[in-house]
C-alpha cells in the first residue's frame, strides 16, 4: 500500500506540475475581427495552439491585473466578454453599452473603461459588481483609451471630432479637450505620466502633449521611401520602459516606425505584414508583436536587433493583441 501511495503521489505531483506549467506558459492572444475568433499563440514555439469562437466583431482586448482573465470588446454583440485563460472558455459578460470598440483597465484592477463608437460615450464599468458606474459624453467616434500610471487621469481620443478628452477618474468629468491631427487612434502615457503620445491616422502624425498643461509640445511625422504619404497612417503606439525606443504602427504603410524618444528621430522602419494595427510586448520587452489586418498574421520583432524574427498566421483581420506571462 505504501508503494502504491508513493507512486500515486508522484503521478499526481507530475500532473499538477504539468498543469501549472501549461497555465503559466507565456501565450499571446489575438482577436480576429472578421472570423469572430480568438487565436492563442504559444510564445515558446510561436505557433497557434487554439482558436476560440467568441462574440461578433471582436476588437479591443485586455488582460485582468492577475492575468487570469481576458476582457474582449465584442463590438457587434454589444458586450464585453470575459474569458477564463486557464480553461479558454467564456465565463461571463460585462455591460458595455452599444458597439464597444476599445478597452482599458485602471491600475486598481477593478475598473474598466470602454469606448462606445456609435454613441460618442465613454462607459465606466465596475468589474466585481458587473455594473456600469458612469457614462461620459465625449466626441464623435471615440476610440483610443489610456489610463495614467498613477490612476488619476484617463484620456479618450475621438476620431471625427479630432480631439483628446481628458477625464478625471475620481469625478468621471471631462476636464479638458485638446485638438489633434485628423482621426486620432491610439494614446499612451509615458512611464512618469508627464507626457501623452497620440497617433493620428489620417493626419499621419504622432503628437506629444504635456499632461499638466494639456498642450502640444511636439509633433512627429513619418516618411517612408517608396510609400505614398496617404498610406502612412499611424495607429498603435508602445513605449519601452528601459530603452529610448517608441514603436508606432503605420497601418497600410506596412511598417513599424522605431522612434528615439530622446531625439524624436525615426531610427528605422521595420517591414511587417499588411495594414499593421496594434502592438504588444512580451514580459521583458525583448519581443514586440504586431497585428497585421489585411495579411491576417502577427509579426514578431526582436526589439534589440529591430528585425522580424517570425510571422504567425492567425485569423482574418487580426485587431487586438495581448501577451500573458503569469
What positions do the PLM features span?
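Bacterial N-terminal signal peptides that target proteins for export
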Residues: 1-10
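Predominantly soluble domains enriched in secretory-pathway, periplasmic, or organellar proteins
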Residues: 4, 14, 20-326
Amino acid at each position: 500500500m505504501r508503494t502504491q501511495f508513493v507512486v500515486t503521489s508522484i503521478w499526481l505531483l507530475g500532473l499538477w506540475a504539468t498543469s501549472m506549467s501549461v497555465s503559466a506558459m507565456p501565450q499571446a492572444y489575438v482577436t480576429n475581427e472578421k472570423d469572430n475568433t480568438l487565436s492563442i499563440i504559444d510564445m515558446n514555439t510561436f505557433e497557434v495552439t487554439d482558436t476560440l469562437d467568441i462574440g461578433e466583431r471582436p476588437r479591443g482586448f485586455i488582460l485582468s491585473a492577475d492575468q487570469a482573465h481576458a476582457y474582449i470588446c465584442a463590438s457587434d454583440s454589444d458586450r464585453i466578454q470575459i474569458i477564463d485563460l486557464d480553461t479558454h472558455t467564456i465565463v461571463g459578460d460585462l455591460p458595455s453599452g452599444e458597439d464597444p470598440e476599445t478597452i482599458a483597465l485602471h491600475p486598481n484592477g477593478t475598473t474598466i473603461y470602454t469606448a462606445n463608437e456609435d454613441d460618442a460615450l465613454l462607459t465606466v464599468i465596475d468589474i466585481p459588481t458587473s455594473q456600469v458606474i458612469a457614462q461620459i459624453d465625449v466626441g464623435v467616434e471615440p476610440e483610443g483609451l489610456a489610463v495614467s500610471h498613477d490612476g488619476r487621469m484617463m484620456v479618450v481620443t475621438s476620431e471625427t471630432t479630432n480631439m483628446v478628452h481628458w477625464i478625471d477618474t475620481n469625478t468621471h468629468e471631462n476636464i479638458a479637450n485638446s485638438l489633434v491631427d485628423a482621426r486620432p487612434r491610439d494614446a499612451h502615457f509615458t512611464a512618469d505620466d508627464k507626457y501623452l503620445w497620440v497617433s493620428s491616422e489620417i493626419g499621419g502624425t504622432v503628437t506629444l502633449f504635456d499632461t499638466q498643461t494639456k498642450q502640444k509640445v511636439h509633433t512627429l511625422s513619418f516618411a517612408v521611401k517608396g510609400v505614398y504619404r496617404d498610406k502612412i497612417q499611424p495607429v498603435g503606439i508602445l513605449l519601452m520602459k528601459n530603452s529610448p525606443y517608441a514603436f508606432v504602427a503605420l497601418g497600410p504603410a506596412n511598417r513599424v516606425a522605431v522612434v528615439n524618444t530622446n531625439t524624436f528621430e525615426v531610427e528605422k522602419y521595420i517591414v511587417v505584414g499588411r495594414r499593421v494595427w496594434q502592438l504588444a510586448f512580451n514580459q521583458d520587452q525583448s519581443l514586440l508583436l504586431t497585428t497585421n489586418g489585411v495579411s491576417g498574421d502577427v509579426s514578431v520583432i526582436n526589439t534589440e536587433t529591430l528585425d522580424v524574427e517570425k510571422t504567425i498566421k492567425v485569423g482574418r483581420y487580426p485587431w487586438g493583441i495581448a501577451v500573458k506571462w503569469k
